[in-house]
């Protein structure tokens, strides 16, 4: 096992490295297909680890003000038929209109979170924040760079807050 740890580090397989002792013990206890069991479990753990890290990265990148699920709002029925993949892949817009307290922000965050869970890159802006960043970019002559960074996202949420 000592030989494996540096190799796992070198390959950047942090999830495997973390769970190697536990999985080796489990494989020894079960004394089944030995190496096959160990390798299969290590690969499963690494996949789970990378998926989790990717989700956390996309959540940080999105800068959502809070985490809201669509199922947590009474207005969820309004958007339950929306397939966020189709909306994004077909470059469609969704506009949420309603009075104060009608859960527009909650629904927008819920849709953004659903997109993040499906591995899309999302960015949440308040209208004021976006306008400020655009003006700042114009003032310092880096509008093109700013727009290029915005284009990297699959979904942009602009909230009125």
Regions picked out by a protein language model, each given a short descriptive name:
Residues 5, 9, 13-65:
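Interdomain "pre-motor" coupling segment immediately N-terminal to P-loop NTPase/helicase cores
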Residues 57, 62-94:
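Pre-Walker A (pre-P-loop) alpha-helix and adjacent loop at the N terminus of AAA/AAA+ ATPase modules
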Residues 73, 108, 126:
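Conserved hydrophobic/aromatic pocket- or pore-lining residues that grip, position, or stack substrates
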Residues 76-82, 91, 122-152:
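Short glycine-rich substrate-engagement loop in P-loop NTPases that contacts/grips substrate
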Residues 86-89, 115-117, 148-151, 156:
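Conserved catalytic network of the ASCE P-loop NTPase/AAA+ motor domain
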Residues 91-107:
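Walker A/P-loop nucleotide-binding motif
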Residues 112-125:
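Post-Walker A helix-loop "phosphate-sensing" segment adjacent to the P-loop in P-loop NTPases
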Residues 160-161:
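Walker B catalytic acidic pair
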């Amino acid at each position: 096992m000592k030989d494996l740890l540096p190799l796992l580090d070198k390959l950047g397989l942090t999830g495997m490295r973390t769970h190697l002792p536990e999985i080796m013990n489990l494989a020894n206890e079960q004394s089944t297909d030995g190496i096959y069991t160990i390798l299969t479990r290590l690969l499963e753990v690494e996949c789970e680890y990378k998926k989790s890290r990717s989700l956390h990265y996309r959540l940080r990148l999105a800068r959502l003000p809070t985490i809201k699920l669509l199922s947590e709002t009474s207005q969820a029925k309004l958007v339950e038929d929306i397939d966020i993949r189709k909306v994004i892949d077909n470059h469609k817009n969704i506009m949420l209109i309603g009075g104060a307290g009608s859960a527009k922000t909650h629904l927008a965050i819920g849709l953004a979170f659903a997109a993040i869970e499906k591995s899309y890159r999302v960015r949440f802006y308040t209208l004021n924040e976006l306008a400020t960043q655009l003006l700042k970019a114009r003032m310092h002559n880096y509008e093109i760079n700013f727009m290029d960074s915005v284009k990297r996202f699959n979904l942009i949420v602009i909230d009125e807050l």
